[in-house]
Amino acid sequence: MGFTIGGIRELGSGSRRRDRAAGSTFVAEYTGRWGWAVRPGARARTGTCSCGDRRCDAPGAHPLESAREVPAGASPDVAACAWADVPGASMMLPVGRAFDILEVAEAAGRRALVRLERMGLPLGPVAVTPDGRAQFFVAPGAAAQLPELLYRMGWDDAPLDLRALGPGTHITAPPCDLGGLGPVRWLRPPAPGTAAAPPPARLLLGTLAYSCHRT
């Protein structure tokens, strides 16, 4: 079944009604079960952005300014009511509250994830984007701490394809479309205990940096 969440697929009116219900279900899961706020996001349509700005520099990959955020902890009824006002919107997760993001190339992220799992380290969710990025959910504060952490680990001078996302940024939530390129997917889905309290960046950073260096 296709989802109109994020403009993944446009179907008939009956399917759109079902997909709107599916959209609010995802929102309710993210807000109620995992403790994340959700913002309605724009979607890409035939090379343009649903925000209406013909010069939009991030079509289908940014929050809708006029749409209200669904707060963390919102009930299914609140989520359904909020999402009924933004049919077809994608789901955007605000970074810097419940989590920050360490982002690397997908190939490096997949290698690092295998190693981290073998080491038995605590891990939060990991998403992969259609443009080949892996996003590791880590404790808030990672974006501010990243330069110092890399320095302490001896990676500050290495040319690494690694960046941190923090307050003021958003990521597209699975299974929404990202900029018309395809859906974002879970490489490691949210789980109780780590979704709302992901591990500190320092536990993952050394392995991620090493994997990036090898790429």
Give residue spans per PLM region.
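DNA replication initiation modules
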Residues: 141-215
